UniProtKB/Swiss-Prot annotation:
Its main location: membrane. Residues 1-19 form the signal peptide. Together with LptE, is involved in the assembly of lipopolysaccharide (LPS) at the surface of the outer membrane. Keywords: Cell outer membrane, Membrane, Signal. GO terms for biological process: Gram-negative-bacterium-type cell outer membrane assembly; lipopolysaccharide transport. It is found in: Cell outer membrane. PANTHER family: LPS-ASSEMBLY PROTEIN (PTHR30189), LPS-ASSEMBLY PROTEIN LPTD (PTHR30189:SF1). GO terms for cellular component: cell outer membrane; transporter complex. This is LPS-assembly protein LptD. Belongs to the LptD family.
Length: 748
């Protein structure tokens, strides 16, 4: 029989509504997946549907139901053998076996007591499982109220099986719907039913909301650091403020404190990182060792932007010796800049203060204090003609240089004619480069002048054609393009040896560099030019219009000897008079990708630079990458290196990764990395072995001087007590000197 009782208080009984989390049933199958609960169709808020084999009325306010009792509301359902409801006192008692279900949990117990007036349900001898995340356990007493679940003498695990890999047993476990966190009191962590750790108080997440607490620690051992433990603590200061405080203990160096503070306001977002080691036990003469990093972006009204990016270290070998999250151990200089930008309708103005901290035994760079630059973003236009002006005012200082102070004023008016059609385009530019210098220092007996004025015209003519045809070569129903390019560039030759080098460096001579209108990044050197550049690109597109192949090649042809780089006497890197550059990409299969490039001196019959990379990317994090690179001049030395990256899934749970890099010039390995990762739905671990060359930036390391560091690192995570996101084994390949980089065109 069935009878509906108007007990309104039952309508407010509900369990915590936990945020949905992606369940990794790929690993655990459906052994822990509890069927999602749905309310009885037709029920409305405040209604109670009670069905039983028999019912006995005990006066006007109470009733006893017996035999296959089912009680349903819009928030929960209850199955029991008997149930006694006292409407006047607001009490519900049921005896078992009992099954209680709601949106987030399913509980089997021997008895149930409900205080309807206080919206609380207590179940005795409970075995529970969660429906919106992996989790199960037992409790002598389980209480459900509006805030969540409270379990007494209880257990919790996210692992399947009769003997879970890990479980928490505690005097009390609270699962809070309001805060999204669970907390335990007097808990013991068991691994394979063996107690391993006592936790007086412990918290863990139920959804993605942030809360202060310890994060997953990591452990490693290496020649350089000895035994290393990293134990981060997360501090959720406010919704827009947080910090991570990380003690890092190294048995051979000491205790380092790493802190990171993040903030977000309506106008600013930023990060401040500080790393500090009071004394390096391996080299006490170094004193305090530290790193400071500050990065901020500011939005100051509609047209104003500000940026800060500052990194500073205590000594040149800090990065190579201690590593950091804010810079790479391969960095040889640190960027420090602050800028204020105004973006108007016609002009963009930047006020910048910048400096490079050069690491190692090298000359210090100049500091720009400040540099004010302006660019016309909306040129004056007439038909296909436009006219624009750009320029800058900069003041440089460097106490260790011959020129210790300098002021540079540069202005560059430019007239352009730009005409474009579908099949071709033509561009002509005429510029006047006017630069004035005031240079101060002990200049007597040097080539530098105190005052310099330099005026140079520049003419650039550029045209490109676009041909297209259907093709069946190498690909069905494909399209091939041919894009020849031609450029003429003229700038007269002028002796610039009386000008210092303040912020100017030689640019890369790749295929795209052949068609630039300058060889340098700054204006302290303006290279003479009287040259044609001829090049072409061909591409293949499949029937889905995806690019599967391209090849580009080009060369500069000089019309006068004075325009050749070796004849200009510029203080720059090695110059080449007949530079040929080519590059290619082949993506013949969705899993395969090949890229290569070369720069060749046709006069000297030598390769300047070359690189080639072959990538394979399969399913489930399967990848292989082979690479080779060569350069005839890197800080005065030739380098030739080859490398291998691989990530192989052994099974659904196991992943193997490895990388190897070799210095062919000196015939030695420079980095070896191998690792193994296991991940299931309830726990994961990573173990890596790493051997790499150690660099001392204060000296040149030859083959006999090279030293190596070997290390083993272990990360262990109990899933369900921390982040629920899946691990990515490829991230292990990014930890070394030569980090893995995903191929640009590989989209699958």
């Amino acid at each position: 029989m069935s009878k509906t009782w108007g007990i309104l208080m039952l309508s407010v009984l509900s369990a915590p509504s936990l945020a949905e989390t992606e369940l990794t049933h790929k690993f655990c199958g459906t052994s822990m997946q509890t069927r999602a609960w749905q309310p009885l169709p037709g029920l409305k808020l405040g209604m109670v549907d009670i069905r039983a084999n028999d019912v006995e009325l005990l006066g006007t306010q109470s009733a006893e139901f017996t035999g296959n009792v089912d009680i349903n509301t819009v928030n929960m359902s209850l199955s029991a053998q008997t149930a006694l409801i006292d409407k006047q006192r607001g009490l519900l008692n049921a005896t078992g076996p009992i099954t209680y279900r709601d949106k987030i949990s399913e509980v089997n117990s021997t008895g149930l007591n409900a205080d309807l007036n206080n919206s609380a349900i207590s179940l005795l001898g409970a075995q529970y499982s969660l429906t919106q995340q992996l989790g199960k356990g037992g409790a002598e007493k389980l209480t459900v109220d509006e805030s969540g679940l409270m379990l007494m003498n209880a257990s919790f695990t996210a692992c399947p099986g009769e003997v879970p890999v890990w479980a928490i047993e505690a005097d009390e476990i609270n699962l809070s719907r309001e805060e999204g966190w669970g907390e335990t009191y007097n808990a013991v962590l068991r691994i394979l039913d063996t107690p391993v750790l006592y936790l007086p108080y412990f918290t863990f997440p139920l959804d993605e909301r942030r809360k202060s607490g310890l994060l997953t620690p990591s452990f490693s051992s290496s020649d350089r650091y000895g035994l290393e433990t990293i134990t981060p603590y997360y501090w959720n200061i406010a919704p827009n403020l947080d910090a991570t405080i990380t003690p890092r203990y190294m048995s051979r160096k000491g205790l380092q404190l790493q802190t990171e503070f993040r903030y977000l306001t309506q106008e600013h977002e930023g990060l401040v990182g500080i790393e500090y080691l009071n004394k390096d036990d391996s080299d006490p003469d170094l004193g305090d060792r530290y790193m400071f990093h500050w990065q901020q972006k500011s939005y100051l009204g509609e047209n104003w932007r500000a940026n800060v990016d500052i990194t500073n270290v205590s000594d040149d070998n800090y990065l190579t010796d201690l590593d950091s999250n804010y810079a790479s151990k391969t960095d040889t200089q640190l960027y420090r800049t602050g800028s204020l930008t105004h973006m108007g309708d016609t002009w963009r103005t930047d006020i910048t203060v910048q400096n490079f901290e050069v690491l190692g035994d090298h000359l210090e760079s100049y500091t720009a204090l400040p540099q004010i630059s302006f660019t016309q973003t909306a040129p004056w236009q007439y038909d296909n003609f436009d006219f624009s002006v750009s320029g800058e005012v900069s003041h440089f200082t460097n106490s260790s240089a011959i020129i210790d102070q300098a002021t540079r004023i540069h202005i560059e008016p430019k007239a352009r004619f730009d005409y474009k059609e579908h099949a071709w385009s033509f561009l002509s530019e005429v510029s006047i480069l006017q630069t004035n210098y005031k240079q101060h220092g002990d200049l007597e007996g040097t080539q530098y002048s105190e005052s310099v004025s330099r005026t140079l015209p520049k003419v650039r003519l550029y045209t490109q054609l676009n041909f297209e045809r259907e093709t069946s070569y190498f690909i069905d129903d494909g399209i091939q393009t041919l894009e020849p390019q031609l450029q003429y560039l003229y700038t007269p030759n002028e002796d610039q040896s009386d000008i210092g080098l303040f912020d100017t460096a030689k640019l890369q001579d790749d295929f795209f560099g052949l068609f630039r209108d300058t060889r340098f990044s700054g204006v302290d050197r303006i290279a003479a030019a009287n040259q044609f550049t001829l090049g072409a690109t061909t591409r293949l597109f499949d029937k889905k219009h995806q690019e599967v192949f391209n090849f580009s090649a080009g060369q500069i042809f000089y019309l006068s000897d004075s325009a050749k780089p070796t004849e200009q006497g510029l203080n720059s890197d090695t110059n080449y008079n007949a530079l040929f550059a080519a590059q290619t990409m082949v993506h013949w299969h969705r899993r395969w990708y090949l890229s290569a490039g070369i720069q060749y001196d046709t006069d000297g019959k030598q390769i300047i630079q070359s690189n080639v990379t072959l990538d394979y990317k399969g399913d489930d994090n399967e990848l292989v990458q082979l690479n080779h690179r060569y350069s005839d001049d890197v800080s005065g030395n030739a380098i030739e290196q080859t490398g291998l990256f691989t990530s192989i899934p052994v099974s659904d749970e196991w992943q193997f990764i490895a990388s190897y890099h070799r210095d062919l010039e000196n015939n030695r390995s420079i980095e070896v990395l191998s690792g193994l990762q296991y991940e299931s739905c309830c726990w994961a671990f990573q173990i890596t072995g790493h051997r790499q060359i150690v660099t001392d930036l204060n000296q040149s390391i030859g083959q006999q001087q090279a030293t190596f560091d070997s290390s083993i690192r272990l990360n262990f995570v109990l899933k369900g007590l921390g982040s629920k996101s899946r691990y990515d084994a490829k991230k292990l390949l990014q930890q070394g000197i030569f980090g893995y980089r995903r191929p640009y065109f590989l989209n699958d």
